[in-house]
């Protein structure tokens, strides 16, 4: 099994005065159907506690993710998951849709009475902050958003426990959505491929045409 993520990287933010850190990861960015989903877990850096068996969600079996989900929620100071639909991805573009999903999760954290001091975001690009725009053609979002400092780290989901835990929450919730949608459109095999562009998914798409849950603005065939 891979090396267990820790809170070592997160702990360095204590020296800058941060106590509550929000680890954030997304799931579904590369799918051709279904939502993009963002998970958040908040940890108290002044009282670091590790959580056994947590890994980046992609490295875990589905049964392990399901088992760990309630443990992650109990371990976190606060946690949340937000989604942006395929229609929103088509209308906004993927970066703004990620921001929309992340903002929805962020506002849930604030509504729970928790205000993180800093954010650790998986990847190299800050798609979460309201002022961040992918291009001149990507509209800046209206309304409230994440106003905490955002730090990005490539492969944070592999080494940082807060981000790996967030990836589990996002993956479990999105997979449940795709299994539910499979009941409406069983031909696409979403119970197995979770909306990703497998050969069988694309073959069904060519035969039946897109559903309302496909990202039709993408070159999905």
UniProtKB/Swiss-Prot annotation:
Cellular component aspect of the GO annotation: cytoplasm; ribonuclease H2 complex
Subcellular location: Cytoplasm
Cofactor(s) required for function per UniProt: Mn(2+); Mg(2+)
Cofactor remark: Manganese or magnesium. Binds 1 divalent metal ion per monomer in the absence of substrate. May bind a second metal ion after substrate binding.
Span of domain RNase H type-2: 19-221
InterPro entries, per the entry: RNase_HII, RNase_HII/HIII, RNase_HII/HIII_dom, RNaseH-like_sf, RNaseH_sf
SUPFAM superfamilies reported for this sequence: Ribonuclease H-like
Keywords noted in UniProt: Cytoplasm, Endonuclease, Hydrolase, Manganese, Metal-binding, Nuclease
Ribosomal protein recorded as keyword: no
Entry keyword Calcium: no
CDD domains per UniProt: RNase_HII_bacteria_HII_like (cd07182)
Residues in coiled coil: none
Principal location: cytoplasm
Primary role: Endonuclease that specifically degrades the RNA of RNA-DNA hybrids.
Listed PANTHER family: RIBONUCLEASE H2 SUBUNIT A, RIBONUCLEASE HII
Protein name: Ribonuclease HII
Gene source species: Arthrobacter sp. (strain FB24)
